[in-house]
Amino acid sequence: MRFLAATFLLLALSTAAQAEPVQFKDCGSVDGVIKEVNVSPCPTQPCQLSKGQSYSVNVTFTSNIQSKSSKAVVHGILMGVPVPFPIPEPDGCKSGINCPIQKDKTYSYLNKLPVKSEYPSIKLVVEWQLQDDKNQSLFCWEIPVQIVSHL
């Protein structure tokens, strides 16, 4: 029994250690306050994103409003121009958030950032926004990244 408990604890600690808080720029969170942004794996910044890989994104935020729904909008910003960055699940209510969103409640938003093999090897800024049912930002953050062929 002790072995099982120790194994479970070790597994939980190793999973927690893989989530790296990143330094981010708030790009206009209107209806919420970002507590923390984690991108995994991203041990150093700018995050090195390998083509063909997928990265976990976890945003802890507190909502300042009530909202029936939420929608993620992600862009890669190249030389000041936002380019849509498709993600597998844009519905925030299917990404770790139990909707309706309540005022003054803290949430953990979870999603994936897939990096397609056909993306060029470049430096850019990822802008990730979660919009409420009035298209206002529950959160908006930016981080610099570099897309690379292989790490």
Swiss-Prot record:
What happens on changing S67P? In NPC2; leads to the synthesis of misfolded recombinant proteins that colocalized with an endoplasmic reticulum marker; normally secreted but unable to correct cholesterol storage in NPC2-deficient cells
Subcellular localization(s) per the UniProt record: Secreted; Endoplasmic reticulum; Lysosome
Q: List the disulfide bonds.
A: C27-C140, C42-C47, C93-C99
Q: Which residues carry this modification: N6-acetyllysine?
A: K116
Extract the Pfam families matched here. E1_DerP2_DerF2
According to the UniProt entry, its GO molecular function terms are: cholesterol binding; cholesterol transfer activity; enzyme binding
Gene Ontology CC: azurophil granule lumen; endoplasmic reticulum; extracellular exosome; extracellular region; extracellular space; lysosomal lumen; lysosome
Q: Tell me yes or no: is Flavoprotein among this UniProt entry's keywords.
A: no
Some GO term, biological process aspect, for this entry: which one? cholesterol efflux
- Segment forming the signal sequence: 1-19
Could you tell me what this protein is called? NPC intracellular cholesterol transporter 2
By which gene is this protein encoded? NPC2
